[in-house]
Amino acid sequence: MNMDQLKRQAAARALEEVRDGMQLGLGTGSTAKHFVELLGERVAAGLKVIGVPTSEATRLDATRCGVPLTTLDEIDHLDITVDGADEIDPELNLIKGGGGALLREKIVAAASDRMIVIADDTKWVPTLGRFPLPIEVIPFGLGATRRAIETAFAQCGVSGQMAVRKAKGGDKDGHVFVTDGGHWILDAQLGRIVDPPSLAKALSAIPGVVEHGLFIGLASSAVLAGGEGIRVIERRKPKGD
């Protein structure tokens, strides 16, 4: 079974949690795209749900698949958000943002009663940090922001190289990647993040940092698909505790 099939299996398992009348957060990325496609099939069969997309790419996918959409300005909460992750640790802390939608993804996850993370089992790691940590920044004053980030790294016991993300493919290939919100992303190769909550707090306090890819205490459960089947891991403490 290839990686794409595993991702679709995880998406199908998460779809079992969806009930008629739910308001859903729709994640971004290759695994979340499988969920949107499968959800569209259920909608075509009569399921009544409404979704909030976390990116323009997901909005286009959901529209193509016939999933009704709304915004967080029009509804007061979401029942479930289903999204992928770049890394998941045993505490269900995440690194997200490989697709560049981390800001909207975090807003939507925080507005949800539950966040279900779907992934193939290669995303399960003992410690976060092998995957580069995305940090969304305002382009103005980037040098000062980078220096403040490096100071935060040192205070939190990590170090590594940062690079401004470049777009890949299409007519923007090689140019600076720009998020849906008009920001840039610094990808930090840290190797091992010894204390994700402390680093998350330090990064959030830096002027010029819009958001970062550490999702701490947001995931309620993770659905991991591998060669031996599906594993569902619940967070030890309920969201909000």
From Swiss-Prot:
Organism in which the protein naturally occurs: Bradyrhizobium diazoefficiens (strain JCM 10833 / BCRC 13528 / IAM 13628 / NBRC 14792 / USDA 110)
Family to which this protein belongs: Belongs to the ribose 5-phosphate isomerase family.
Entries under Pfam families matching the protein: Rib_5-P_isom_A
Name of this protein: Ribose-5-phosphate isomerase A
Residues forming the catalytic site: 105
Complex and partners: Homodimer.
EC number annotated for this UniProt entry: 5.3.1.6
NCBIfam families reported for this sequence: PRK00702.1, rpiA
Residues binding substrate, per UniProt: 28-31, 83-86, 96-99, 123
Pathway where it operates: Carbohydrate degradation; pentose phosphate pathway; D-ribose 5-phosphate from D-ribulose 5-phosphate (non-oxidative stage): step 1/1
Classification via InterPro entries: NagB/RpiA_transferase-like, Ribose-5P_isomerase, Ribose5P_isomerase_typA_subgr, Ribose5P_isomerase_type_A
Catalyzed reactions per annotation: aldehydo-D-ribose 5-phosphate = D-ribulose 5-phosphate
Biological processes, Gene Ontology terms: pentose-phosphate shunt, non-oxidative branch
